[in-house]
C-alpha cells in the first residue's frame, strides 16, 4: 500500500523526534512515558481469515503489560473486542516489584467492540472519538510512542493523529520485508539462498519460473510458491514435479496444464482461484524446495534502535508443520549451538544493509539449515519486517528473568548466571478445549502447578487465552533450565489439558 505524501512527511517528522528522545524514553525507568500498544495484524484479509482465531492474535502483545514494572510508565492497550479481566489480572500478577493495584492505575484498556476481520488500526481510525480519548491520555507526546505488530499506511496515519512516533519501520520500506524484497537483499549481499525467482506478478510468471527451475535442476522434485505478504506459511504452496521431464519440448505447457492440480496450498480452505487472485494482487516468488535428511529452520531476531545501532537479540529453531512442513507452529530458544554463531555473520550483514536503508525496530530473518558432509549449510529464506511468532515469547522471558542473550556463547543468561530455555507455540489446538474459559484455564494451571514460578524462574506462560473457549486454541511459552525441561513443561501441560477435558468434556 503506497504511503500518501502528507502522511509520510508527518510520520518521518515524528520518527526523527523519537530518535532525539530515545535515551530518556528507554533508559530512564522513572520517566513519565506513555506506550500505546496497537496489536493490529494489518495484513491481507484473505490470508488472515485462513488463520483460526486470528483476532485473538491481538493478545500476543499483552506481554508488553510488563512495561508497567516501571512505576511512572502508562500503558494504553487497544483491542478489537474487550479482553477478559481475568486475562489482564493474569499478566499483572507477574509484575516484579510492583503491586497489581499500582499497575492497574496506569493501564488503560480500550476496545473497538468490533469483531469484523478488518484491521484493528482501521477500526480505531473509523472511531474518531476513540482516537480523541487515547490522545487525551498522552500527557507528554515527546515521551510517548506506539508499538504495533507491523507498520502500514494505516499505522502511520494513526501515529500522526496521536502525535506520537512508532517503534517500527517506515511503511515506505515495507517492500524490504516481502518475499521478493528479501530475496533482492540477499542477492545484493551474496547471502546464500534457495535457487528461485522473485517479483513475479501472476500465474504465467509462476509457470515460467517453475519451468526455469526444473530446467536448471532436472532432479528437482518440488518447488515452493510464496505470496509476498503471506505469514506463518499461509501464503505458501508446494508444486510437485512428478513425472515431468526437464528435457520435454512441451514442459511449459505441461506445467501450465497441471498447475491447478499439482499446487498444494498450505492455507486451510483456500482454493486455487483465491490463491491465484491473492498472488496477482500481492505478487510473489517461486523457489526450489530444498531437500535434506537433516534440516532445521532457525531464525535470527534483530533490532535497530532509533540511534541506528544494530543488535542480534535472539535466535530460535522454528518448529514447522502441516503436510508441507511450511506452517509455523512454534519455536525453541535458543537455536542450536552447532550453528547459532554461524548465523550471526549473514544476519549482521543483512541487518547492516537494512539499517543503511532506514529500517527501524525489530525484525526476523528466517533461514533453512541443511546438514551435509559433516557441516551445516545455511540458506536465507525471508526477512519478516514486523513482530513475529518469536517476538512475544522472548519479550516474556526477558521481562520475567531480566536476562540477555549472548550471541557468542549461544546462551541466555540471567543476572544470577543461570541459563534459561523455552519452547513456545501459538498453535496449541484441540477441539476438546472448546468451552474452557480463561478462568477455567488459570484454575487448571494453578491446581496442577503449571503456572510460571517466580522463585524457580521456570514454568508456563499462556497467551491468546481468549481464543480457547470458541476455537479450542491457545499459545504457550514454557520456560525451563534446559531444552528438555522446557519441553517437559509443554508436554505436561498438554497432558493435563487433555486429561481434564476428557474427564469433564465441554467443561
Segment roles from a protein language model:
Residues 1-177:
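ATP-binding N-terminal substructure of ATP-dependent carboxylate-amine bond-forming enzymes
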Residues 49, 89, 158-161, 234-241, ...:
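Short acidic, glycine/serine/threonine-rich loops at helix termini
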Residues 150-151, 200, 229-231, 288-291, ...:
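Short, flexible loop/turn elements at secondary-structure junctions
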Residues 172-283, 333-345:
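Active-site nucleotide/adenylate-binding loops and adjacent lid/helix of ATP-dependent enzymes
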Residues 240-244, 304-309, 371-374:
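Short acidic-glycine loop/turn motifs at beta-strand connectors
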Residues 271-294, 312, 324-375, 414-450:
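A long amphipathic alpha-helix within ATP-dependent nucleotide-binding catalytic cores
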Residues 321, 380-394:
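Glycine-rich phosphate/pyrophosphate-binding beta-alpha loops
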Residues 402-507:
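Peripheral (often C-terminal) accessory segments that flank ATP-dependent C-N-forming ligase machineries
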